[in-house]
From Swiss-Prot:
Belongs to the class-II aminoacyl-tRNA synthetase family. It comes from Roseiflexus sp. (strain RS-1). Binds 1 zinc ion per subunit. It is found in: Cytoplasm. This is Alanine--tRNA ligase.
């Protein structure tokens, strides 16, 4: 069996299938773009899910990928297993080949055999193949079994298993089918190999590849017209097999990350071997952290953000158990970027942001740890003193709520002391807190509702659809939670009238503002709500005089603000219609904000909108505005409105009689004018919007004036958000954009029509100058290093160079060492520098000396105590660190003596 690096495995897999007609497709994000039900991308087929379901057509029928994946839940992906287990991971890479109705088993299995036995040269005598044994619903997969034998497999090595192991389903509906898994025996004694080890817990049997054959429709179990293939091979496991080791952590994917930890600690391999789990956990978690942040996830308290925070903090805690006292994780994540950046460019492109995010989160967690550990230690002592072995849920909750200690960390520390945590009690307190949170969000309004519910009032008559002014009589006054007969100047007040033109906040539309003027004084209205059904309450302050129960008042809504709100509300209806026209009827309203200065519209859609889609939506809305179509409303039964085609918002409660707002619709309540019809025909598309809505609207669409989208973003899985401006606000926004363009054009000395070309030319010029600067910097660095070659010394026949240099980081120090070692040809290089006030020493030996006469690890072990530290490493390369950077010259003077002692000269 040949030995291959992980990079070679990746490339040979992709090239093999590329040569057989497959398109090499880049990895998709860890955040699924087309599946709001999935937290993270957990297999290679996720990005092709819509293709397999027939919802999406791709320009190819064969694909091959290396997909980045994350699994952090489920029986086989318990986070606590990462580290102690030799093969569990959070982040991993999945190699795959896919057929979308192209080839099937008769081509997939021979290709798999050829790749495994001819390209990867896996020993046939160690391979096992499993197929579906069949059941009452699906026949046995005899075809796959026969194809494996025809390809060259020993019939005795083709085993049959049931649905649990060899049948794949996507969901309750959609494609499904049998799968065939390839397992390799990696034990030392072939005589101990047997069929009983396959699909068992025996670590000598490693499943390396699964070939899924989608050939049935799940709901009916009828054969698919176009069966497909989906395969998945874990790169980490394949690297383990092809590098002849028994743990994925011993492969070239993880060794550099473990070595970086040891170097930072000034420890050697024996330290790692004595306690492997924490080092492995840090290595694994660093990869997950790097890729999650690169794909846009930030640490937080919910959803994906919480998963990232949990992984990152677990890595920090594991690091502390082996001696890291200060922030270190960014250094390990930097090693991930250094190692994986060539394969996944997003790591390099976002490196600074990734490292800054990791450092900030780690420092925040260290503050949490320092505050919480003393409390937890006190709890542990108290529990032990009481003779119990269980930390109460109340204490675990306090640690989480007050000190930010996550439950899993409390459980881990408790386990280290032989204790457990009352998880049920903890969850009970958490649920109580969630209930309080839900109540707190509505506490003020709930308390007010209780007050108003105790006041016997008839429903308020709303007159605001037809007017922005009106008269009414004060029915009730509430001040500081109490019903009163009179309120005086300066008091915060809540007032109910028998009739009002003020609109109460509802359906996303904010409440009106304005004034109430009575015979005794004036009230400034700052908000309007319905604390109880049917009753409209004005919230504000008595500006002058007083207001008394039963006073007649004149109610005046801020008409300019109301007009702006109406423009934005009608615009949301036009936007909703345009979204459905452009994206599809699935684009349903999921929330909105209609304010005087802007509108916000949330809708169901799984993908970001393209610039073309946004432009088309905006074009349609503005065409409908120019058409100056009447906006009409009518009250009718709910059933009649639905039959007329009105859209009812999901989750909204409607009465028997509803208000339907219609815009356009030739057969509507008020048909468009001939001019409007001509405008619509010119625009090239009809418009008909009917929605159930109790809000206030403009009389004609032309009153909106102008509509501009200013942002489009994600709110939650499967929910997008558009923010937009209308009328004067939209005009001001456009004016600002034009002013910016004019300023930029003037600054770069180009007319606006040539601005893009000028900016592109400036960018190209900047890049050219940067390249020249980089080349100059590199030449200067080489010149400085070349100068060091003049100070090469000898001990007997061994040449060596020992020097103090300036290096910004460990990676640069190693680059300098590599260059000098190569220039030296034969000899030893010892470089020292200062990072963050601490000494760092690097030793390298050329291949002819390493492990024979010179051991770099032992060399730095001898030098490290001089600078107050420790270190170690391989025979050819080792690093050490120490607290006393002032003694670097002393350590370098000692190099000759150490070399002489090692070489015996």
């Amino acid at each position: 069996m040949k030995k291959l690096s992980s990079a070679a495995i990746r490339e040979q897999f992709l090239r093999f299938f590329e040569e057989r007609g497959h398109v090499r497709v880049p990895s998709s994000s860890l955040i699924p773009g087309n599946d709001p039900t999935l937290l993270f991308t957990n297999s290679g087929m996720v990005q092709f899910k819509d293709t397999f379901l027939g919802l999406e057509q791709r320009p190819y029928t064969r694909a091959t990928t290396v997909q980045k994946c994350l699994r952090v839940s489920g029986k086989h992906n318990d986070l606590e297993e990462v580290g102690p287990s030799p093969r569990h991971h959070t982040f991993f890479e999945m190699l795959g080949n896919f057929s979308f109705g192209d080839y099937f088993k008769s081509e997939a299995i021979p290709m798999a055999w050829e790749l495994l036995t001819k390209v990867f040269e896996l020993p046939v005598e160690r391979l096992w193949f499993t197929v579906f044994e069949g059941d009452d619903e699906v026949p046995p997969d005899d075809e796959a079994a026969q194809l494996w034998v025809a390809a060259g497999a020993d019939p005795d090595r083709v085993l049959r298993f049931g649905r649990k192991d060899n049948f794949w389903v996507m969901a309750d509906t959609g494609p499904c089918g049998p799968c065939s898994e390839i397992t390799i025996y990696i034990g030392d004694d072939l005589r101990a190999m047997s069929a009983q080890g396959v699909n068992s817990d025996d670590p000598n049997y490693v499943e390396i590849w699964n070939n899924v054959f989608m050939q049935f429709e799940r709901s009916t179990m009828q054969p698919l017209h176009r069966p497909s293939v989906d395969t998945g091979m874990g790169l980490e496991r394949m690297a383990m097999v092809m590098q002849g080791v028994h743990s994925t952590y011993e492969t070239d994917l993880f060794i550099p990350l473990i070595e970086r930890q040891l170097a930072l600690l000034g420890a050697d391999e024996s330290t790692y071997r004595a306690r492997v789990a924490p080092y492995r956990a840090v290595a694994d978690h660093s990869r997950a952290v790097a890729f999650l942040i690169a794909d846009g996830v930030l640490p937080g308290n919910t959803g994906r953000s919480y998963v990232l925070r949990r992984i990152l903090r677990r890595a920090v805690y594991q690091g502390r158990t082996v001696g890291f006292e200060k922030p270190f994780l960014a250094e390990i994540v930097a090693a991930v970027i250094e190692q994986m950046g060539a394969v996944y460019p997003e790591l390099r492109e976002r490196a600074d942001f990734i490292l800054e995010t990791v450092d900030l989160e780690e420092r925040q967690f260290l503050r949490t740890l320092s505050g919480g550990m003393s409390i937890l230690n006190s709890v542990i002592e108290r529990v032990r003193a009481s003779g119990s072995t269980v930390i109460p849920g109340d204490d675990a909750f306090t640690l989480k709520d007050t000190y930010g200690f996550p439950l899993d960390l409390t459980q881990k520390i408790a386990a280290e002391h032989g204790l457990t945590v009352d998880e049920a009690g903890y969850e009970r307190r958490m649920e109580e807190q969630r209930d309080r949170g839900r109540r707190a969000a509505q506490f003020k309004r709930a308390a007010e509702a209780e007050v108003w519910a105790g006041i016997d009032l008839p429903p308020t008559r709303f007159t605001g659809y037809a007017a922005v002014s009106g008269s009414g009589v004060v029915q009730a006054i509430v001040v500081a939670g109490d019903q009163v007969a009179e309120a005086s100047a300066g008091q915060q007040v809540q007032i109910a009238l028998d009739s009002t033109p003020f609109y109460a906040e509802s359906g996303g539309q904010v409440g009106d503002t304005g004034v109430l003027i009575g015979p005794r004084g004036r009230v400034r209205v700052e908000d309007v709500q319905r604390p109880v059904p049917g009753v409209i309450v004005h919230y504000g302050v008595v500006e002058s005089g007083s207001v008394m129960l039963h006073d007649p008042v004149d109610a005046h809504v801020d008409s300019g603000r109301r007009a702006a709100i109406m423009r934005n509300h009608t615009a949301t209806h036009l936007l909703h219609r345009a979204l459905r026209d452009v994206l599809g009827e699935h684009a349903a309203q999921a929330g909105s904000l209609v304010a005087p200065d802007r509108l916000r519209f949330d809708f169901t859609h799984t993908r970001p909108l393209t610039p073309e889609q946004l432009h088309e939506i905006e074009r349609r809305v503005n065409a409908w505005i120019r058409a100056d179509t009447p906006v009409v409303w009518q009250e009718l039964s709910y059933q009649a409105a639905i039959e007329a085609g009105a859209i009812a918002l999901f989750g909204e409660k409607y009465g028997d009689v509803v208000r339907m707002v219609t815009i356009g619709c030739v057969n509507g309540h008020d048909a468009p004018s001939p001019a409007a019809l001509a405008e619509r025909e010119l625009a090239g598309f009809p418009m008909c919007s009917r929605e159930l809505c109790g809000g206030t609207h403009v009389g004609r669409s032309g009153e909106i004036g102008l509509f501009r989208i200013i942002s489009e973003s994600s709110v939650a899985a499967g929910v997008r958000r558009i923010e937009a401006l209308t009328g004067p606000e939209a005009e001001a926004w456009v004016d600002a954009q034009i002013a910016t363009l004019q300023a930029v054009a003037a600054r770069v000395g180009a007319p606006q029509t040539q601005l893009v070309e000028r900016v592109e030319a400036l960018i190209a010029e900047l890049k050219q100058r940067q390249r020249a600067l980089d080349e100059l910097t590199a030449r200067m660095a080489r010149s400085n290093l070349e100068g060091l070659l003049a100070s090469v010394q000898s001990v007997g026949d061994i040449r060596f160079l020992a020097a103090q240099v300036e290096a910004p980081n460990a990676a640069r120090l190693r680059e300098m060492g590599d260059w000098l070692r190569d220039k030296l040809g034969s000899g030893v290089v010892v470089l020292a520098t200062v990072f963050d006030g601490k000494a760092q020493i690097l030793a390298m030996a050329t291949p002819d000396l390493a492990g024979k006469r010179i051991h770099a690890g032992n060399l730095v072990k001898a030098l490290a105590p001089i600078v107050g530290g420790s270190g170690g490493g391989r025979p050819d390369m080792a690093q050490a660190g120490g607290r006393d950077s002032a003694k670097i010259p002393q350590a370098l003077e000692h190099v000759a003596a150490v070399i002489a002692a090692q070489a015996g000269v």
